[in-house]
Amino acid sequence: MRIMGLDVGSKTVGVAISDPLGFTAQGLEIIQINEDQEEFGFERLGELVAEYKVDKFVIGLPKNMNNTSGPRVEASQAYGAKVTELFGLPVEYQDERLTTVAAERMLIEQADVSRNKRKKVIDKLAAQLILQNYLDRNY
């Protein structure tokens, strides 16, 4: 079963994919989106779904530290609803608190990546962490 992890932002969607057995998550790419112009990257997402034969989506849910809904929760849920509508696949949500912080820390401490390079990969790594957390919890 292949599961695709998504880190939905206002300008980008980080994409990760599980291995076929559901043990590990790997970052795939970052899809550029534009909420103001209603460009959400669904065409590219569809290409990846077909290429990797995806069975399910896991979308990061950006909750606040006190477990209340953050300002992006509704946007993530709306994106998930559209994904279900377009691809007919189930969507589950994974708490993504601190995943972007953890991703940035990994890039700084372990890879010594510059700020400009971090911006280019941070959402992909966050999607990978969201998906890996989901896999660790469920499989």
UniProtKB/Swiss-Prot annotation:
GO cellular component, one term: cytosol
Localization per Swiss-Prot or TrEMBL: Cytoplasm
GO biological process, one term: rRNA 5'-end processing
EC code(s) of this entry: 3.1.-.-
A molecular function (GO) term: nuclease activity
Main location group: cytoplasm
EC class (word): hydrolase
InterPro entries reported in the protein's UniProt record: RNaseH-like_sf, YqgF, YqgF/RNaseH-like_dom, YqgF/RNaseH-like_dom_sf
Keyword Hydrolase: yes
Keyword NADP applies: no
Transmembrane residue ranges: none
Keywords: Cytoplasm, Hydrolase, Nuclease, Ribosome biogenesis
Any Pfam family the entry gives: RuvX
Superkingdom of the source species: Bacteria
Function according to Swiss-Prot or TrEMBL: Could be a nuclease involved in processing of the 5'-end of pre-16S rRNA.
Family stated for the protein in its record: Belongs to the YqgF nuclease family.
Protein's name according to its UniProt entry: Putative pre-16S rRNA nuclease
Record organism: Streptococcus gordonii (strain Challis / ATCC 35105 / BCRC 15272 / CH1 / DL1 / V288)
Organism taxonomic ancestry: Bacteria, Bacillati, Bacillota, Bacilli, Lactobacillales
